[in-house]
Curated annotation (Swiss-Prot):
It holds the Pfam family p450. Belongs to the cytochrome P450 family. It comes from Medicago truncatula. Its main location: membrane. It catalyses: oleanolate + 3 reduced [NADPH--hemoprotein reductase] + 3 O2 = gypsogenate + 3 oxidized [NADPH--hemoprotein reductase] + 4 H2O + 4 H(+). The gene is CYP72A68. GO terms for biological process: saponin biosynthetic process. This is Cytochrome P450 72A68. CDD domains: CYP72 (cd20642).
Amino acid sequence: MELSWETKSAIILITVTFGLVYAWRVLNWMWLKPKKIEKLLREQGLQGNPYRLLLGDAKDYFVMQKKVQSKPMNLSDDIAPRVAPYIHHAVQTHGKKSFIWFGMKPWVILNEPEQIREVFNKMSEFPKVQYKFMKLITRGLVKLEGEKWSKHRRIINPAFHMEKLKIMTPTFLKSCNDLISNWEKMLSSNGSCEMDVWPSLQSLTSDVIARSSFGSSYEEGRKVFQLQIEQGELIMKNLMKSLIPLWRFLPTADHRKINENEKQIETTLKNIINKREKAIKAGEATENDLLGLLLESNHREIKEHGNVKNMGLSLEEVVGECRLFHVAGQETTSDLLVWTMVLLSRYPDWQERARKEVLEIFGNEKPDFDGLNKLKIMAMILYEVLRLYPPVTGVARKVENDIKLGDLTLYAGMEVYMPIVLIHHDCELWGDDAKIFNPERFSGGISKATNGRFSYFPFGAGPRICIGQNFSLLEAKMAMALILKNFSFELSQTYAHAPSVVLSVQPQHGAHVILRKIKT
């Protein structure tokens, strides 16, 4: 039956109407809304580039990133232009009250310490930005919000209490002794050698976190963490493409490899956890590793809530937290150790002061928990390394609802960015020597060094401060104590200074040093 003219007209009208409504929504999403937000930002004195369709400043961001990574920098600790080039460029060009466009959303760059303190402390008003590509690297606590975050944090916290870390100190010692033995085997007949210490330090921290996390299942844990490192490299390689809508669904070789790794990681971790759960049900003693402590705390939480299983963590949630152990415990500490060795190579007087302190406290004895906590000069050095070379260069947060932040009015859906490396290097906050290695500034502790201002947060801050910071600092003290007892070191002529961001701030071309065995 042929449709009447009126019916055809109605169908055409409906189709055109739907098409116009859809076109309007797309136009509003892609252009009108970003331009409206830009106008509101400029009215408040914020400066930045005009919005550009779809990608905003993202293309320039990645082009600049690629350019700075094409060659090493001078031997200087003014690393912000290299590790955060576009953010640094934006602030230099537009001033401290500025913004950039990351895709269709503006990042308002916060440089005022009190504004940053407020963002960190008000986690419900400023939740974490959830990037889809990051879920393949970080899971668990770091991705959660609200009551779910509170539950996970409550269950995980006991595993990172200082008394539990004290129990793990022998594990740290074993892995660090293995490192020293391996380095000794590489020495020439005159007791010295040139080597890139970066791979060894990565291997050390991976070994420590695998032993500390999984105990008897340590070898399986190491394989999982190696796959996670590969995931991080693949994701950073495809970071710009991930901004293209639906890109992540294309069956590229990298995407297939990412999916394959993902299945292997999940399967291996589930097997480790299920094996441990069976041992607990059989009445075997809980292992004093992070997984054992996590499962013990989880069972206690369930029991306290009348044995209601969903009051604790599910298998998938425990897997997520195990994956987070690696990111929190391996990346941060290996970065801290490598930059500590680079800086102590460049400042031999501080290297000697640190060595003298280690020998005074431990002599020929093995480093232990109590002694490590007495290393004041070592703590000053590590704090200063974390100031100059923070593990992450900045942190983004989403604006949940329209809110006043100091003299700024922020609107729901916008994002704020806290440039850690710029704050840590700010001469107005740290003095004229802000870009120079000077551990003495921390001789009176962090509060005195910052003059009470919120200008130092290498592990984040507020309720969401990194749960593994004490673990990382304790491991770093153990490793450096043993390295300083056994070796002196200086930079090799082949060392190329190239701090670079691959999830965290790492040496792009390694860390080539000359090791010399200390005769005892």
